[in-house]
Amino acid sequence: MTAPSHPSGFDWSRLERVTADDPLRVLFSACLLGHATGWEGGAYTEPLAVRLAGLPLVRAMYFCPENATLGTPRPLTTLYDGHGRDVLSGRARVLETTGRDVTREIVRGAEAMREAARRGGAELAVMLDVSDSCGSHVVYIGAPEEHRYQQGPGVAAATLMEAGVPVLAQRDLATLQRLIAALDPTFTPDPAAFDFVDHPWYRDYFADGPVGIKLGE
């Protein structure tokens, strides 16, 4: 197959060598597989993620970095002064809507997810976009009620990327479907599907730069 460039660092030729004895090891944000680990105690189940996780040639793992250190339910958090990589370098913070600084807890949760990936030999992570921890394309910046977004990863996604684990968002529908089709010949991808960076909202919102200057949707 012609290897796409997304997600960065993923070895698409690996799919040609996957077997039941040597499955593709994929780490998921727990909420995408139906686990009630969202900040308000809910799940954000993504059918394509569930289908991928259930394939015989996939060994699925799941983890919620925020649940690991802050529990569930918990106050909503958001990033200030940058995205996840900026948090890891000490230039940005993560605050709850209550005003409490939980940067340390979010970083510890990200490190715990990295350790889970290491133990499980994760070759790919499928994560919840926009999340301050698991986002890969887009995360909030500033107070959530302002609905402002920035390009960049969340803290856990950035931590995994730095550890060499490629990250795919649940909104990357074209790539998810291509991945499933490569592992399941009964699956037919939707030719009209596209990844999140090709969504009209994404292209319009970030047309002027990496931080949106108008209210999001």
What does each model-identified segment do?
Residues 130, 134-157:
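Short Gly/Thr/Asp-enriched flexible loops that form oxyanion-binding sites at enzyme active sites
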Residues 34, 70, 132-135:
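Short, active-site-adjacent cap segments at secondary-structure transitions
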Residues 44-94:
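Short, surface-exposed acidic-centric catalytic microdomains
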Residues 31, 128-131, 172:
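Short, well-ordered beta-to-alpha junction loops that form the rim of enzyme active sites
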